């Protein structure tokens, strides 16, 4: 006597359910608050960042707000960029494995030549760790459109576009950082093909 059995694999798609009502992230409302970016935190909460016009006294500035796992604001919104001259805008944020997070943004004129990209690390309570730091090594012309991704072990990686660094309009560059926020190696070109423009890149970490 032989027994035969068969099974079918099924998957269930769960319909997302809203939790509570929509809420306003920014407290300061004069001018414009735009370009928001959100990252989850390892403790169950999340952090929102955005750029705000005129709030820091000089053009655009970058601000943030922490939320707990229940969606309640933790503390007040806070200014992220220390340099306030000209514009600091278009932020990117990623959570880190230690419960903190890192924010990066474009800053006009700070590196001495057009836009550069800068960052600031925070602990889980939104206290700044160290001072803001320049991410791009090459400073000629423009470096902008910064994106971040966290890495296993507590580090993170950034990518951005740089004007004429590869010899032909826009190219895409990256830089790794260790868990202490120190650059790990040199910045590197990501695109191999350099004719015309390479831009609008995204970044994601892999489990290995």
Where are these regions (language model features)?
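Extracellular glycosylation-rich, acidic/polar low-complexity regions of adhesion-
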Residues: 1-14
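Extracellular, repeat-based ectodomains that mediate carbohydrate processing or recognition
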Residues: 13-208
């Amino acid at each position: 006597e032989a027994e035969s059995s068969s099974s079918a694999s099924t998957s269930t798609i769960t319909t997302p359910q809203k939790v509570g009502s929509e809420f306003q992230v920014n407290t300061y409302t004069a001018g414009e608050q735009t370009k928001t970016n959100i990252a989850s935190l390892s403790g169950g909460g999340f952090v929102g960042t955005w750029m705000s016009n005129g709030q820091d006294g000089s053009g655009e500035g970058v601000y943030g707000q922490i939320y707990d796992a229940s969606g309640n604001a933790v503390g007040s919104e806070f200014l992220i960029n220390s340099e306030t001259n000209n514009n600091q805008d278009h932020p990117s944020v990623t959570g880190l494995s230690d419960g903190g997070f890192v924010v990066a943004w474009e800053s006009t004129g700070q590196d001495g030549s057009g836009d550069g990209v800068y960052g600031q690390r925070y602990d889980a309570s939104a206290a700044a760790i160290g001072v803001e730091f320049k991410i791009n090594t090459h400073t000629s012309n423009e470096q902008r459109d910064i994106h971040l991704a966290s890495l296993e072990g507590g580090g993170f990686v950034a990518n951005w576009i740089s004007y004429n660094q590869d010899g032909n309009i826009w190219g895409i560059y990256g830089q790794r950082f260790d868990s202490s926020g120190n650059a790990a190696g040199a910045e590197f070109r990501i695109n191999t093909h350099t004719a015309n423009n390479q831009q609008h890149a995204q970044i994601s970490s892999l489990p290995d």
